[in-house]
Amino acid sequence: MGKISSLPTQLFKCCFCDFLKVKMHIMSSSHLFYLALCLLTFTSSATAGPETLCGAELVDALQFVCGDRGFYFNKPTGYGSSSRRAPQTGIVDECCFRSCDLRRLEMYCAPLKPAKSARSVRAQRHTDMPKAQKEVHLKNASRGSAGNKNYRM
């Protein structure tokens, strides 16, 4: 014998179908296309299993996420909690043997390098001075009060 549905379920299905029929007449074909595209996207992503990254794919993903900073295959010492993970766990263990997300990849990026500050004039060597100042500096250095005496250093 067939399965008998409850009355509220049948009423809901009937009302929902009528609602969809009215909406379908109002919807243009482009709206219908985008709706179908969204449904396909959601169903394909829902049925896809967790993906893993190994080899060149893992390296490409790390280069994309980390950019110019670079990355580590093992976490640097003292990075993250060592109590919940084995000490030798690396990115391959986490993303190749199991699936991992973007945050997990970011954990293996090298830290940002601080921007180099401009050198002050005082910190520059005398060889970095403009030529006119260098000549004055050399002339003044040769005019010492020592006269013709030679000092040994």
Swiss-Prot record:
InterPro entries per UniProt: IGF-I (IPR022341), Insulin-like (IPR016179), Insulin-like_growth_factor (IPR022350), Insulin-like_sf (IPR036438), Insulin_CS (IPR022353), Insulin_family (IPR022352)
Maturation-removed propeptide residues: 119-153
SUPFAM superfamilies in UniProt: Insulin-like
Region of interest: C: 78-89
Gene name of the record: IGF1
Region (B): 49-77
Cystine connections: 54-96, 66-109, 95-100
GO biological process: cell population proliferation; insulin-like growth factor receptor signaling pathway; negative regulation of apoptotic process; negative regulation of release of cytochrome c from mitochondria; negative regulation of smooth muscle cell apoptotic process; positive regulation of cell population proliferation; positive regulation of D-glucose import; positive regulation of glycogen biosynthetic process
Chain spans, region D: 111-118
Keyword terms: Disulfide bond, Growth factor, Secreted, Signal
Family according to the record: Belongs to the insulin family.
Name of the protein this chain belongs to: Insulin-like growth factor 1
Record text on subunit structure and interactions: Forms a ternary complex with IGFR1 and ITGAV:ITGB3. Forms a ternary complex with IGFR1 and ITGA6:ITGB4. Forms a ternary complex with IGFBP3 and ALS.
Superkingdom of this protein's organism: Eukaryota
Native source species: Ailuropoda melanoleuca (Giant panda)
